[in-house]
Curated annotation (Swiss-Prot):
Purpose of the protein: Allows the formation of correctly charged Gln-tRNA(Gln) through the transamidation of misacylated Glu-tRNA(Gln) in the mitochondria. The reaction takes place in the presence of glutamine and ATP through an activated gamma-phospho-Glu-tRNA(Gln).
GO CC annotations, alphabetized: glutamyl-tRNA(Gln) amidotransferase complex; mitochondrion
Location within or outside the cell: Mitochondrion
MF terms (GO), sorted A to Z: ATP binding; glutaminyl-tRNA synthase (glutamine-hydrolyzing) activity
Similarity comment text for this entry: Belongs to the GatB/GatE family. GatB subfamily.
Protein name as annotated: Glutamyl-tRNA(Gln) amidotransferase subunit B, mitochondrial
InterPro entries: Asn/Gln-tRNA_amidoTrfase_suB/E, Asn/Gln-tRNA_Trfase_suB/E_cat, Asn/Gln_amidotransferase, Asn/Gln_tRNA_amidoTrase-B-like, GatB, GatB_Yqey_C_2, Gln_synth/guanido_kin_cat_dom
Statement: the UniProt record of this protein carries the keyword Protein biosynthesis: yes
Native species: Culex quinquefasciatus
EC number(s) stated in the UniProt entry for this protein: 6.3.5.-
């Protein structure tokens, strides 16, 4: 079987790490009942990767003891003033440029007023009126193996990118009937990215979030650890029949993973369609995604618009960014011109390079690039000094063999401690015909169990006799024995039933525990059966 055929046969559902964010059924706007159409817009809060907070020198540390990372200004002690963190501005500009946004030469901060116990000032500092950047476009591939037949590209416009501070965290104790407040998160720097409602399915929304994660990680502007709350996604969803006005939207919050983005949106679309088909009404409300029950739950009504009483922040001057002309030196100047020259290669550029340089399929390029660890292994194996390896063999091995073993063991790629050098050694053994795909998986399974300090693949194969039988004399004797033991099968083959040849080859594979060289085995069987 060819590598491409093996790739097609073994392609499995692939997610934010190596498992898919696919829902059970393919999301297809054309297939919605009664010609319903869905409209989806995302709001993403990304925690800026900075050592200190947006307006104070307090440390940003996930998992720190309660209230251990709080400056006086974070607790809104009277007499304290905010001081803008330059690093956060630079990373915000860097992100805006990567998304094709137009960076504003002058932006401003506002106060957004609302009352929560974990917001001691009674307002949040944000950029509502004059954000750091506007416009922009994010184009991304939508491809879920086993769900979408072929990848296609979708684009979502970026409405604006703004800087803002996070609130603290309230901890409710229903037994003691008390609420406790942790201000470690208060003042943590955030970028809010608001996308236009250009999406139609949950899969498209999940693909957008995945692409955004790849971009932010490459830029170094956000860790994107959703399990730590470093990236939070809110989805605005509405449905309407074709050729009718847009429906009433709901906002779904608390979406904590890429896979949950697709699940939450598809659930909410189905819920709204059911309500409208039953003659009901959709309310403009905020709903929470329950990952355990896999459904959205009403939180609060938005029918009455809340007045946040936005006003200019009097304690912060306008933010000036140098956006055109020659690079402007100086510690007090953030230069978008200079930042643009330092942008890394973005994921889509990497995919195009893989397809054009290594002649891999777009599907393979998407799977390789969509996982940072997988792409790192691919590059390490190909770029090893003094070695020339086939990109197709390397890609197929990583996708079909490594990911299959990890998926079988429910191990994430980041938790896999097999070194790239060991993976490269298995590729070499495949290319030199010392092992086949079956033996490669046995070796991978053993290497996974042994971990980083385990034996090399060559040692594992030698100790367990997991090397292919390539000796022609030995294979010929096996062929003769099988032919002699199966006279009826031989007779059928000689009468024109060519498939019987593979029945004989299958017997040899069983006898040798899949270690016989099948190409040589088939050749020898054909030659012996002609006599």
């Amino acid at each position: 079987m060819s590598w491409n055929a093996l790739f097609r046969r073994n392609l499995f559902i692939f997610n934010f790490r190596h498992r898919s964010f696919a829902t059970k059924k393919a999301a297809n706007p054309v297939a919605r009942p009664n010609r319903w159409r869905s409209v989806i817009g995302l709001e993403v809060h990304a925690q800026i990767q900075s050592e200190s907070k947006l307006f104070s020198g307090a440390e940003v540390s996930f998992g720190a003891p309660i209230n251990a990372c709080v400056a006086l200004v974070d607790a809104s002690i009277p007499g304290t003033l905010p001081v803008l963190n330059r690093r956060c501005v630079e990373l915000g500009v860097r992100t805006a440029l990567a998304l094709g946004c137009e960076v504003a030469p002058v932006s401003a901060f506002d106060r957004k007023h609302y009352f929560y116990a974990d917001l001691p000032a009674g307002y949040q500092i944000t950029q509502q009126r004059a954000p750091l950047a506007r416009g922009g476009l994010l184009t991304f591939p939508v491809f879920v193996p086993g769900v979408t037949k072929k990848p296609y590209y979708k684009s979502a416009r970026v409405h604006q990118l703004q800087l803002e501070q996070d609130s603290g965290k309230s901890l409710h104790d229903p037994v003691e009937r008390k609420s406790l407040v942790d201000l470690n998160r208060a003042g943590v720097p955030l970028m809010e990215l608001v996308f236009e409602p250009d999406l139609e399915t949950g899969e498209e929304a999940a693909a957008l979030v995945k692409e955004l994660i790849l971009i932010l990680t490459r830029l170094g502007s956000c860790s994107c650890r959703m399990e730590e709350g470093a990236l939070r996604v809110d989805a605005n969803i509405s449905v309407h029949r074709e050729n009718t006005p847009l429906g009433t939207r709901t906002e779904v919050k608390n979406i904590g993973s890429v896979r949950a983005v697709a699940q939450a949106i598809e659930y909410e679309i189905a819920r709204q369609i059911d309500v409208l088909d039953g003659g009901g009404r959709i309310f403009n409300e905020t709903r929470n995604w329950d990952a355990v029950e896999r459904k959205t739950i009403a939180m609060r009504d938005k029918e009455v618009v809340q007045d946040y009483r936005f006003m200019p922040e009097p304690n912060l001057p306008p933010l000036h960014v140098h956006v055109e002309g020659d690079y402007c030196e100086g510690d007090d100047v953030v230069s978008a011109v200079k930042i643009r020259t330092d942008l890394p290669e973005l994921p889509e550029e990497t995919r195009k390079s893989i397809v054009e340089t290594h002649h891999l399929t777009p599907e393979m390029a998407i799977i390789l690039v969509n996982d940072i660890t997988l792409h790192s292994h691919f590059r390490s194996i190909l770029d090893e000094p003094g070695k020339t390896r086939s990109p197709k063999v390397v890609a197929n091995f990583l996708i079909n063999e490594l990911l299959t073993i990890l998926n079988k063991n429910k191990v994430d790629l980041e938790e896999c401690h097999i070194p790239s050098s060991h993976l490269a050694e298995i590729v070499d053994m495949l290319e030199t015909n010392r092992i086949n795909q079956y033996l490669a998986r046995l070796i991978l399974q053993e290497a996974l169990e042994q971990g980083a300090s385990g034996q090399s693949p060559s040692q594992i194969a030698a100790d367990r006799d997991w090397l292919m039988i390539t000796d022609e004399a030995k294979i010929e004797q096996l062929c003769r024995d099988v032919i002699q033991r199966n006279p009826k099968v031989v007779e059928k083959y000689r009468s024109g039933k060519d498939k019987m040849l593979y029945a004989l080859a299958g017997d040899i594979a069983k006898l040798t525990e899949q270690k016989a060289d099948m190409a040589r085995t088939v050749e020898l069987l054909k030659r012996l059966l002609k006599k």
